[in-house]
Amino acid sequence: MDNKLEKMKELVEELNQYAYEYYVLDNPSISDKEYDLKYDELVILEKKTEVTLPYSPTQRVGDKILGEFSKYTHKGRLWSLDKAQNMEQLIEWHNRNLKVIEQYNSMSEDKLPELRYIVTKKFDGLTVNCTYDENGILIKSATRGTGIIGEDITAQIKTIKTVPLKIKNSYVIEVHGEAIMTKTAFEEYNKAAQVPLKNLRNGAAGALRNLDIKETARRNLSAFFYDVGYNEGPEFKSYREMMNFIRNMGLPQDKYIKECTNMEEVEKEIEYIESIRGELDYDIDGAVIVVDDIKTREILGYTIKFPKWAIAYKFEAKEITTKLLDVEWNVGRSGRVTPTALLEPVELGGVTVKRATLNNMDDIKRKNVKLGAKVLVRRSNDVIPEIMGVVEESLEESEEIQAPDRCPYCNSHLVQNGVHYYCENTLSCKPQMVKSIVHFASREAMNIAGFSEKTAEQLFEKLDIKSIADLYKIKKEELLTLEKFKDKKSQNLIDAIQNSKNCDLASFIYALGIPNVGKKTANDLVMKFKTLESIKNTTIEQLVEVPDVGEIVAKSIYDFFEDEKIISNIEELLNLGVKPYYEEERIDENPFMDKTIVVTGSLNNYSRGEIKDKLQSLGAKVSSSVSKNTDYVLVGEKPGSKYEKAIELGVKVINEEEFSNKIK
């Protein structure tokens, strides 16, 4: 037993070091295959010994659903930062600091040093506090909360691969950081999500406040650490020293840290950060300027809310205040009834905004949003604007938003499930049926060419199409009665419907509209179970073994195929001649098979999604970062830092023309 435990400790130390090299340093020393072999060996030993070390990498898997969030009292307070909107306000802050230091030095023999500032980026994510004990083990992680009391998110933080579960430290510390979702992770998640995320910040916040840990893991969060908020070890003399300590502990840290001795230098760095803002793989909303010397910080002190020795310079945000005129309730394909805010039109980021997202009634109540009130609207990453909060002073003459009790379209009684309201009238509720038909016919589903929402509406209203199976019963002469349907268009649609009967199984599964199942999950299900019959009869336990399928998604799939009406509809589709098929994909030998490839820059003949699909069809592994284990970097126009990293590491670089020649 002792030998096995020693071997486990050895494997855990090795695997954590390899993970640090891979995720933090971006410079792995072993191959993925070697890592997987050691990881599998550790899993076997943990099962045999029934012992799992608290800092074992197997604790990152995230395969449980928690009951609720518990409170955690921070050992050291998490302060908010005062904000400057322009250089004049920043200079005022600087002059106040100078005045306090001059007064102190005039009365004290122990002089404070020349004022020196450290400038860093201000990340637009969710503040987190991680506690490591005297053995260096991560024992607690929590949200900021009030700054004094937060919520325990330890299990969620452990899914972030860059956050070490153990550090080489012998006293209790709390480190503050920002959990973020990168643009790369955001795009990857949305490819497979039935309900796409709206922006990076919500992606991170929603992941950390999700009780389904596997869903948190799916979002592939990252983190940057920038402060030691509580420390039972030797005191730091400067912020530089503190940041070096954080880095030496193996905690992920942004490389950009600049020292400035005057406001001209600070302004130059702020301008630089703003200039690279759009190139970053994550969101920032400003710069943070802090006093470097710790003793000077102590002399400057705090207000009730903020430290006087730090300030955030906020970039011009894509946010604005306007009036909430009304709330419109819309019905989606799943029957979910969701609110949309109707706003007094306002210009935001070069666009006239009239509507904004309100996720559900819980969201409305939490943000205290009311009719007639002034609301703060944010537009991130060019997606649908979202209401972030309300102007408190505008609430006096406002009205409460009432949740509907009937469907706004078919007048059926709504049922509440969790935070959402649903219309269960799937047969005659127009928005549900129309959106279901459009989804079924879409390119990634059954690929019925020439099918639009307008066509679906006519089929529902004039041809009484009440189920997906009814599509395969439509006759040409019926289509000729519809608006703008002549002979050729009618025949083309009939042909397209008939041609769709021979479809691949993954497209059919996706077309069925299973809640929480996107095209990627549909593909993964087919890869795992091979046949429609197997997928229909699988268990929740088997479903969670599918990559990226957690308890919630597994239950959605299981419940879907338990519904007798759905099974009846599927049987009717099969009886009408729909024949989903699955063929094991065979990949011909090619130069990119089993190679790791990174893509950077814009390509002429492929979008980012298309080139990824193409490479994967060639048997290649597509990575988002360059390391010495990368085989090729495919470079397009205006490549980013990945190109420079490839040159630095001596990785083979090819352009689009060379790529095309290699696959001819």
From Swiss-Prot:
Say which enzyme class the record assigns: ligase
The reaction(s) annotated as catalysed by this protein in its Swiss-Prot or TrEMBL entry are: NAD(+) + (deoxyribonucleotide)n-3'-hydroxyl + 5'-phospho-(deoxyribonucleotide)m = (deoxyribonucleotide)n+m + AMP + beta-nicotinamide D-nucleotide
UniProt-listed NCBIfam families: dnlj, PRK07956.1
Q: Which GO terms describe its biological process?
A: DNA repair; DNA replication
Disulfide bond recorded as keyword: no
Q: Where does Zn(2+) bind?
A: 407, 410, 423, 429
UniProt xrefs under Gene3D superfamilies: 5' to 3' exonuclease, C-terminal subdomain, BRCT domain, DNA ligase/mRNA capping enzyme, Helix hairpin bin, Nucleic acid-binding proteins
Q: Which residues form the signal peptide?
A: none
| Protein known as | DNA ligase
- Which cofactor is recorded for it? Mg(2+); Mn(2+)
> Which positions in this protein are listed as binding NAD(+)?
32-36, 80-81, 144, 178, 314
> What is the protein's known function?
DNA ligase that catalyzes the formation of phosphodiester linkages between 5'-phosphoryl and 3'-hydroxyl groups in double-stranded DNA using NAD as a coenzyme and as the energy source for the reaction. It is essential for DNA replication and repair of damaged DNA.
GO molecular function terms here? Answer: DNA binding; DNA ligase (NAD+) activity; metal ion binding
The entry's family comment says: Belongs to the NAD-dependent DNA ligase family. LigA subfamily.
EC no.?
Answer: 6.5.1.2
Gene for this chain: ligA
Where does the record place a coiled coil? none
**Entries under SUPFAM superfamilies matching the protein:** BRCT domain, DNA ligase/mRNA capping enzyme, catalytic domain, Nucleic acid-binding proteins, RuvA domain 2-like
